[in-house]
Swiss-Prot record:
It comes from Burkholderia cenocepacia (strain HI2424). InterPro entries: Elp3/MiaA/NifB-like_rSAM, Methylthiotransferase, Methylthiotransferase_CS, Methylthiotransferase_N, Methylthiotransferase_N_sf, MiaB_methiolase, rSAM, rSAM_horseshoe. One of its GO terms (cellular component) is cytosol. Residues 143-377 form the Radical SAM core domain. It comes from the Bacteria. It is found in: Cytoplasm. It catalyses: N(6)-dimethylallyladenosine(37) in tRNA + (sulfur carrier)-SH + AH2 + 2 S-adenosyl-L-methionine = 2-methylsulfanyl-N(6)-dimethylallyladenosine(37) in tRNA + (sulfur carrier)-H + 5'-deoxyadenosine + L-methionine + A + S-adenosyl-L-homocysteine + 2 H(+). Its EC number is 2.8.4.3. The lineage of its organism: Bacteria, Pseudomonadati, Pseudomonadota, Betaproteobacteria, Burkholderiales. This is tRNA-2-methylthio-N(6)-dimethylallyladenosine synthase. Belongs to the methylthiotransferase family. MiaB subfamily. Pfam families: Radical_SAM, TRAM, UPF0004.
Length: 457
């Protein structure tokens, strides 16, 4: 009987990418297949996030629930990976003695060896070292599921914002060699991937050697240009970027590379220079707005999303008003916004914070409501227009229909003859948007490529 692995992912897209790699590593080494049901699993892994306290505590809550599964199935192995593992290390085993494996983001490729050591010794295995780029040298080729894929181009972050734990849990910035990234993207394209999202904690800081050991360096703009030249790749996205390193070279890339989507996630974190300074972000609101102004001069239709922290220590009503003014001016088309959560070991955790929780919550609700209104307005403005989408697969709402994604990252559901589904999936097609809903759009097929056209008859 085929053994199975269950992975629960918390947090960012980097973690989603790492979770897929965990499955790939265990499939290549031990033939394990992925399952969506923990009760069916022989190995249960939690890929964790420590950016906010709530996410961290939820991991231990989930661990408590799977403990019962291990009692019923003694051979079951339980592992904790990701940023909580990197931060907490062996203390996870002290708190939850039934955990067998603790590994960091940089050591997931060692899972097979850790499993062997656990079975041989009967003792929990902990490996949260930072072996830099070694991870990518030991990962098997990706197994593609659909026409979109993530590709990690670098690890870690060297910005050390005062509130952020990432540099301590993922290490400093280390870039993959250019040819290594291009080889992975080309392999994905050969398997039918049409859209890649280049991943990193701060992709703007990418400085990859042209080849392993080379002293010649490629910046992020160069990487994008090379990826765009790979046959089969139709769209390029990236996340996450940092305003401080959004260079003119990168801005100019939006004029040179049509495959680079007109959708940008650029975290601002706050709209007050005073708070940005306390956060150690390294830029002002005016500098942030200057980047967006230059980008929109090239791409007037640029869709913008961001991250925002409400209730940072010392935030006044005036600071929050400045944040809201920026929201209105930028016209954000999504924001990942949260109340500030102090993380142990970060400088901001020691700052005095006298703003009541109720005030922070009220501010957050106001911010999120304003952005939701803007999201609805943008979605409604798309009704009646023809949008180019990448068809990703059957619709979640109705498997008899198909779903694709627009450049500004909206899901579009549309009807298509069942016989055409296999041929349409993975293609770029045009749809006319007929309806806008809170979290999706609905449209109709209006124009497809010659290959897809024959599939609809």
């Amino acid at each position: 009987m085929t053994k199975k692995v269950y992975v629960k992912t918390f947090g960012c897209q980097m973690n989603e990418y790492d979770s897929d790699k965990m499955v790939d590593v265990l499939n290549a080494a031990e033939g394990l297949e992925k399952t969506d049901t923990p009760e069916d699993a022989d190995i249960i892994l939690f890929n964790t996030c420590s950016v906010r306290e709530k996410a961290q505590e939820k991991v231990f809550s989930d661990l408590g629930r799977v403990r019962e599964l291990k009692e019923a199935k003694p051979g079951l192995l339980i592992g904790v990976g990701g940023c909580v593992a990197s931060q907490e290390g062996a203390s996870i085993v002290s708190r939850a003695p039934y955990v067998d494996l603790v590994f960091g983001p940089q050591t997931l490729h060692r899972l097979p060896q850790m499993i062997d050591a656990r079975r041989a010794s009967g003792r929990a295995q902990v490996d949260i070292t930072f072996p830099e780029i070694e991870k990518f040298d030991h990962l098997p080729p990706a197994r593609v599921e659909g026409p979109s894929a993530f590709v990690s181009i670098m690890e870690g972050c060297s910005k050390y914002c005062s509130y952020c734990v990432v540099p301590y849990t993922r290490g400093d910035e280390v870039s993959r060699p250019l040819d290594d990234v291009l080889t992975e993207v080309a392999g994905l394209a050969d398997q039918g991937v049409r859209e890649v999202t280049l991943l990193g904690q701060n992709v703007n800081a990418y400085r990859g050697a042209l080849t392993a050991g080379s002293t010649d360096i490629a910046d992020f703009a160069t990487l994008i240009e090379y990826v765009a030249d790979i046959p089969g790749i139709e769209r390029i996205r990236y996340t996450t970027s940092h305003p401080k390193e959004f260079t003119q070279r990168l801005i100019d890339t939006y004029a040179k590379v049509p495959k680079l989507v007109s959708h940008l996630h650029l975290p601002v974190q706050h709209g007050s220079d005073r708070i940005l300074m306390a956060m150690k972000r390294g830029y002002t609101v005016l500098e942030y707005k200057s980047v967006i102004r230059k980008l929109r001069a090239i791409r007037p239709d640029l869709s913008l999303s961001t991250d925002m922290i409400v209730g940072f220590p010392g935030e006044t009503e005036d600071d929050f008003d400045k944040m809201m003014a920026l929201v209105h001016e930028m016209g954000y088309d999504t924001s990942f916004s949260f109340i500030y959560s102090p993380r142990p070991g970060t400088p901001a955790a020691n700052l005095a914070d006298d703003t009541p929780r109720e005030v922070k919550l009220k501010r957050l609700q106001h911010l999120q409501a304003t952005i939701e209104e803007n999201v609805a307005r943008i979605s409604q403005s798309m009704v009646g227009k023809v949008e180019r989408i990448l068809v990703e697969g059957p619709s979640r709402k109705d498997p008899n229909e198909l779903a694709g994604r627009t450049e500004n990252n909206r899901v579009v559901n549309f009807p298509a003859p069942l016989a055409s589904h296999p041929r349409l999936i993975g293609q770029m097609i045009d749809v006319k948007i007929n309806h806008a809903y809170p979290h999706s759009l609905r449209g109709e097929l209006v124009l497809v490529s010659d290959d897809a056209s024959t599939a609809t008859h």
